[in-house]
């Protein structure tokens, strides 16, 4: 039907959609002053609410990162940056900061939902958080973590879960934990056209079988087992793989043997890229909280947030806030009419 529309009409309609129509309401009837102007199609528009999820777009919009982009970066030796996100704001800032991959990791079970470990989170919760992050992410490649219990039973179960992540979670790829035993499952998913990020070394969903959060590959045989896992996952079609809590030298040697990128977390500087949990590295929790050895804190969001909220509390208590500049005006005439109406009622 749209193909029958005259091109001139379509062009006119496009121009009309960008025209800002001035309000016909008298100034005295305006309920509030503009919070900020929006520029749409060159015309300034007025806003009376701050409840918009997006701020101004970046001055220079990045190209969308794809699997092809990541392969090209790997060939050039350009380190791949990966950051977790669990909601719209964390996805938004990670994307604006230029992350190549944003991972909606099941670590959100602990850092966003207050659960004891990653095994508690369920599929529907992960899908909800994936959708939130996906709405904020315009350039980075997004990956969703398949939660425990949604892919281990059979390759068919795993594929069904992966499809839901793409269709309902709106991410571009999925991540799952496990070594060579998961190769048939990964093959099933990648054959269906869904990119898979593998995860070897320390696999947190299996911490009970591993004896807790312990460094893996500290013996020759243990390191060889991880290499075998890596080669099997590569053969199954993974576009990259996370290598967690493995000695730096072991991770570097494994990286050299592979033709796909490795993303290290607690695996030294010889991998193809790095990933950190966002709330850990920006300092989202109070001092004294346990952090793994490999985490470097780049900020103090907890401290800044605490100072801001305490300042707000103090200003509300002292009636310093809201100040006149934070309130909306009413004309003297209308205020007089309203005051009279209140007295007469």
Report residues per predicted region.
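N-terminal mitochondrial targeting presequence
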Residues: 1-63
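Alpha/beta enzyme core
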Residues: 40-44, 48-296, 303-345
């Amino acid at each position: 039907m749209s193909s029958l529309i005259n091109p001139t009409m379509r062009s006119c309609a496009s121009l009309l959609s960008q025209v800002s129509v001035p309000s016909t309401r008298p100034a005295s009837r305006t309920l509030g002053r503009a919070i900020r102007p929006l520029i749409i199609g060159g015309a300034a528009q007025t806003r009376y609410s701050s409840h918009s999820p997006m701020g101004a777009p970046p001055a220079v919009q990045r190209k969308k990162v794809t699997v092809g982009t990541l392969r090209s970066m790997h060939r050039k030796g350009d380190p791949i940056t990966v950051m977790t996100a669990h909601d719209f704001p964390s996805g938004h800032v990670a994307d604006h900061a230029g992350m190549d991959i944003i991972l909606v990791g099941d670590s959100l079970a602990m850092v966003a939902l207050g659960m004891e470990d990653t095994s508690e989170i369920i599929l529907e919760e992960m899908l909800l958080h994936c959708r939130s992050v996906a709405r904020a992410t315009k350039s980075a490649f997004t990956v969703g973590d398949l939660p425990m219990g949604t892919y281990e039973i059979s390759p068919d179960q795993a594929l069904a879960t992966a499809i839901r992540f793409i269709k309902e979670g709106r991410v571009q790829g999925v991540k799952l934990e496990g070594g060579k035993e998961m190769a048939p499952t990964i093959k099933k998913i990648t054959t269906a056209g869904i990119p898979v990020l593998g995860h070897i070394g320390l696999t947190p969903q299996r911490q009970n079988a591993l004896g807790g959060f312990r460094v893996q590959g500290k013996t020759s045989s243990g390191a060889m087992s991880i290499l075998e896992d890596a080669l099997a996952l590569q053969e199954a079609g993974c576009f990259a793989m996370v290598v967690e809590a493995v000695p730096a030298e072991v991770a570097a040697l494994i990286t050299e043997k592979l033709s796909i990128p490795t993303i290290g977390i607690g695996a030294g500087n010889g991998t193809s890229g790095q990933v950190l949990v966002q709330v850990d590295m920006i300092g989202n929790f109070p001092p004294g909280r346990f952090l793994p050895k490999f985490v470097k804190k780049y900020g103090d969001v907890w401290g800044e947030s605490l100072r801001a909220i305490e300042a707000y509390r103090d200003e509300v208590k002292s009636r310093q806030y809201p100040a006149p500049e934070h309130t909306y005006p009413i004309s003297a005439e209308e205020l007089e009419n309203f005051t009279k109406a209140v007295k007469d009622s």
